[in-house]
From Swiss-Prot:
Catalyzes the attachment of tyrosine to tRNA(Tyr) in a two-step reaction: tyrosine is first activated by ATP to form Tyr-AMP and then transferred to the acceptor end of tRNA(Tyr). The gene is tyrS. A motif ('HIGH' region) lies at residues 37-45. This is Tyrosine--tRNA ligase. It comes from Methanospirillum hungatei JF-1 (strain ATCC 27890 / DSM 864 / NBRC 100397 / JF-1). Its EC number is 6.1.1.1. NCBIfam families: PRK08560.1 (NF006330), tyrS (TIGR00234).
Amino acid sequence: MDTYARVIRNTVEVVTDEELRSLLDRPVRKVYAGYEPSGEIHLGHLVTINKLIDLRDAGFEVTVLLADLHAFLNRKGTMEEVKKLAEYNRRCFEGLGLTDIKYVLGSSFQLSPEYQILVHELSQAITLNRAKRSMDEVGRQMDNPTVSQMVYPIMQMADIAMLGVDAALGGIDQRKIHMLAREYLPSKNYPSPVCIHVPILQGLDGKKMSSSQGNYISVAESEEDIRKKMKKAFCPPEVEDNPVLQVLQHHIFPRLDTVTIERPEKFGGNRTFGSYEEMEQAYAKGEIHPADLKTAVAESLITILAPVREYLK
């Protein structure tokens, strides 16, 4: 796989493709992704983690921002609580293979005078409506937002500037914030970042992934629980909006070279696949039973997540 193909695989959008190709010609290129510290790291987080590993392997200098101050502003806990979660998250990410990169705690630079002045300068230029719209996909209780939540996207823009990165990675829900950065940072003599967006995956029940619904798999989940959750997962005969196939595409094949469907000879015997595309095609033709697919995905996930479970002990 060439460098460009590795960078764009499993993405939904790059803004812009021309700028990305130009960036890949540079000897030094830097990218970042930010994470609000969370009590559970799950498959939703793993989409960007997998992409950061791709970017690292493609020659990017990778920075992970552990956004403790952002989490505090977004009502996720006290500063003390979110700092503890940030350290736990770092250990999870390292256990998932996100090593040989830089981890930065947001509060280590976001309280500096230089950073705060940039935030205030940007806030002068951006209307309240633009700030609120940019937060609609990522904020809590946005029908009645706090002033701190309006500062959140402006801080994210300042992060891109202060970290000195060429590209920003995030879920497609970050798009509006990233577009603000592309529009306004050049006016403050900072380059417009290349923006790389990955999809927001469905929960295992086919609905929006949510901690309150428990429709996700944590990276620290037991083998038994992974099998139970995957067995109950929504897996329609169609390819579209199939959460089990999404796990296969975005989590299994980026990390494993092959996946084997194990079944008795009377049902066709074992069959090994070397790519997601090959497996999706076979499933669409009815050559793989949903129950067999779910079993294979569960066992593959157990293999992939074993190192992080061991690392966290």
